[in-house]
Amino acid sequence: MIQAIVTDIEGTTTDIRFVHQVLFPYARERLTPFLRAHQQDDDIAALLVDLRREIAQPDADIETLITVLHGFMDEDRKSTVLKAIQGIIWRTGYLQADFRGHVYPEVAQQLADWHQQGLKLYVYSSGSVAAQKLLFGYSDAGDLCPLFSGYFDTHVGAKRDVSAYQKIANQLGIAPQALLFLSDIRQELDAAQLAGWHTCQLIRDLPDNDSAHPQVNRFDQIVLSLFTE
C-alpha cells in the first residue's frame, strides 16, 4: 500500500518549457550583475566557497566563478551551488510577479485529493529546495506548499543514483515498497526501482518505448491501488 508519493518537477508536474524558456533565461541574464553586487553577502559568499571547492580552485576570483557558472548552465550541470544561486535569483522574479510557477492543469487537484486521502507528498528535484518551494508557492494554481510534507534536492544525491532513493526512504522512515516516485525520466525511475520503490512515468508527449515503468499522461490517470507490495 502506498503511504507517500515523491514527485519530480520538470516534465512531471511542470512543463519543461517553463523551466528552459522562462526560469533558466531569467537567471542567466541576471547572474553576472547579481554576483558582482552580492558576492560579499553571507549566503552568497558561502556558496562561492563551495563552488571554489567544487572546481578545486580555492583562489578563483569572482569573474572566474561567473565564467564557471555560465559554463555549468551551458552544460545543464546539476551543480548544487548553481541551483542554489538560480533559486535566489528566481525568488525576486516570483516576488515581483515576473512569472508564476507552471503546473499542468490536473496536477493541483490531484495533489489535493491525495493529500486529503492522508497520503504524504514530497518533492525530489535537481533544483534547490528553495526553488522548489518558490515554484509551488507561487504557482499558477495558487500556493501548493501546504500539500507537501517535505522537499529533497541534490543534497541527497543525483536523481539517477540508487543511493539517493535509499537516503530519502531512510529519512522518511517509510519502507521503499510503500513509496511511489513520479518522473518523466526513465533512468531516474530505474534508480528508484532498484532502491525498492514503486514507479510511474509521466509521458506528456510520445510513449517511451524503452521504458518498463507504468506510463500515464496525466496525474489523474494514476491508480494507486495498482501499486501493491
Swiss-Prot record:
Q: Which gene encodes it?
A: mtnC
Which Pfam families does the UniProt record give? Hydrolase
Q: How is the cofactor bound?
A: Binds 1 Mg(2+) ion per subunit.
Disulfide bond sites: none
Q: Indicate what this protein is called per its UniProt record.
A: Enolase-phosphatase E1
Q: Please tell me the species this chain comes from.
A: Yersinia pestis (strain Pestoides F)
Q: Which family does it belong to?
A: Belongs to the HAD-like hydrolase superfamily. MasA/MtnC family.
How does the annotation summarize its subunit structure? Monomer.
SUPFAM superfamilies from the UniProt entry = HAD-like (SSF56784)
Q: Which InterPro entries match?
A: Enolase-ppase_E1 (IPR023943), HAD-like_sf (IPR036412), HAD-SF_hydro_IA (IPR006439), HAD_sf (IPR023214)
Report the function annotation for this chain: Bifunctional enzyme that catalyzes the enolization of 2,3-diketo-5-methylthiopentyl-1-phosphate (DK-MTP-1-P) into the intermediate 2-hydroxy-3-keto-5-methylthiopentenyl-1-phosphate (HK-MTPenyl-1-P), which is then dephosphorylated to form the acireductone 1,2-dihydroxy-3-keto-5-methylthiopentene (DHK-MTPene).
